Amino acid sequence: MSGKQPDAGPPPIQLWTRDGFQGALSAVTRSTYAPEYLSVEGPHAPRRAVLERLTPDDRDDPDALPTMIATSRQGVRLHVSARRKPMPYVVRNVEADEIHFIRIGTVRFETDVGCLTASAGDFVCIPRAVAYRYAPIGEAMHSVIVESPAALKLAPPLPSGLLNTARDLKFAEIDPDMPVGGPTRLVLKTFDAENTVFTLPHDPLALGMRLSDSVPVWKLNLAAIQVHAYLPEGGPPSQFLASTTGDVLMFNLSARPGGRPPVHINADFDEVICYVGGPGAWGGCTEPGTLTCVPKGVIHHGPSEDVPEGYQAWLLETRATLRWTPKALAVAELMETGQYLPHPSVSK
């Protein structure tokens, strides 16, 4: 069995929706609890992983790239990084925009449009073909990286309310004191099995002055993104970021007042949630850095988000069909889709 059937009361509503909650919708009730399942075989199954149980390659090997934990035919991918030393090379991702979410630590990013320092809770946007490197300030850092082949941009439902970009959006700034240095490796990151590496005579991130107003590299803290609440019954969260094609959406899924979400069949989007941390628990997610994934078409309910103690989490929705990599599967568990606990069959 899976999850916990709600206590006495009316049967939970079951929704089937297209385009997230923006398209066609069907609502029904049923006498049984739809998210329950006895077992599952195959890759299209709900899973969860505590990221602290996975050691990224770049933690102990400065030359390594971040470790991929999920991939897709469409090119949407997830990685984790835990560097303890600076990158000894520069990367230019020529296939995808990247969003780096800093879970732990403080990280300095140097790019060929400027530098910024990001702290725990910050999202850092590095668009396609912007060269960069990063390093922890201190002994440790941990980040989750989302790759999107389509361009990413801030896309709140209204110009004001969810975001205060004038106050909270911070852009990379040129460091005029960065030395030009000597020979530097530039890794062009592509979908090929082997990356292309140029050796340059100087550091490509050493800049002179800015001549344009536009700065494509920015940071925004999760705590600065407002939650969208519907009282008393509750309703879907509002996106703060989207790809230009609508294939990738990101939401603040932190604690908010309102009713528990309905039982849901999301016809078009895989749902990946990162539980950042408490003090409150989000259902079965109590360990910071717990990552959950419910593939499209899998019936789920999900925990209540009305947690008085408070917690932080974010949601990634993607039309891409994600598949966990072997390294991620080694630390992942089958998940029930009621409270997002490990499925009971895991302990048998």
Residue ranges of model-derived segments:
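Jelly-roll (double-stranded beta-helix
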Residues: 1-348
